[in-house]
Amino acid sequence: MALARFFIPHLLISLCAICLHNGGWWPWTFFLGLSVLVTIGDRLCPRDHADLQGVNPRTANALLFAIWPLLIALVALVIVSVAVGIQQVTLPLLGAGYAERWDYTPLQVLGVVLSVGLLIGGVGTSAAHECMHRPRGHRLRTVGDWLMALSMDGVFPIEHNHGHHKNVGTVHDAATARYGESVYRFIGRSTWGEYANAWRVERERLERQSRGLWSLHNRYLRALARSAAFPILAALVGGGFCALVVLLSMLWAKVLLETVNYIEHYGLVRVPNAPIEPRHSWNSTAWMSGTITFLLTRHSHHHQHGALPFWRLNDMPDAPMLPWGYLSAIYIALLRHAHYRAVMQPHLDHWFDHYASREECQLAARS
């Protein structure tokens, strides 16, 4: 069954829930174990050239839909465990032993944040990205909105569909990392640009429809409310510290999302209004990364045909390729940025020599 591998994200969320249930150092074990599994798996597994054209779309969509309740349940477990174990909140149906099991130290809480944020940012936002490219009115669009809210980025679908896919590779795209730009500078610039552009897009949409800006018709305001709902719920159940843990998990997921943006287009350029081609994205055939991200790794084909569902994306082996899998690239960009730039330099040189148009080379030389 071609889709069998895409049950792995669901198993990972379930495994993380078991680790949270066990408490103690188990969340750290999950985070480190998953990081090693994906980074080494990307190196050892065969390149991902699988053709999924014949899969059942209803099954594939069901896999995406299922990520939503699983991650909501995982966040709920975080709220309950911190509320009971640290805030000493008494909840019905839970025995006294849970308070001791979930009495996390600050370092153990960090393990919870890293584990849950990794799944939200790696699995959740990837499923959300797939959902928000569905036709308007499709039920998965709502799933995508709520999944993006978990990464403190509910406005992402507005800007991504109307901005990034139109402006990728140009100076008008906040989500394209510039040559030599550090990932931390990029995260700030991209986030600010995304929120500002999403507000502009939504304001113009409401003006065209003669609807009020400060109303329930405003998708931007609804997106902010969805993101705020999770830490507010955590505060109501378990107090301020519980809300902080949930908020930090969501912010870590946001960092991961922006770092994915960073690695997908780092240093690439495109002349404004020129056709978007496979060369304008860094592609990857890493099997583990592709499995966990629902083939977000086939980014070159995605940007050429944004409406295609993940099972119809081709691997495009002739597109520019990342030298690592996604998670390896993320960790290197975050922890060893100078090394990231050094390794990417020959790949960028090759891109300008073999992929870039004359106009793109001239554009890069002037920037």
Listing of model-derived features with the role each one plays in the protein:
Residues 1-17, 136-220, 241, 246, ...:
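Cytosolic/stromal cytosol-facing helical appendages immediately following the last transmembrane segment
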Residues 1-45, 58-87, 93-121, 216-261:
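Alpha-helical bilayer-embedded segments of polytopic membrane proteins, i.e.
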Residues 42-52, 125-130:
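C-terminal ends of transmembrane helices
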Residues 48-51, 81-91, 132, 267, ...:
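Juxtamembrane transmembrane-helix termini
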Residues 52-62, 270-278:
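Alpha-helical transmembrane segments with an aromatic anchor "belt"
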Residues 52-53, 96-100, 200-207:
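Short membrane-interface loop/juxtamembrane segments of multi-pass integral membrane proteins
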Residues 59-188:
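Intramembrane catalytic core of multi-pass membrane enzymes that act on lipidic substrates
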Residues 129, 164, 233-234, 299:
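Structural hydrophobic-scaffold residues in regular secondary structure
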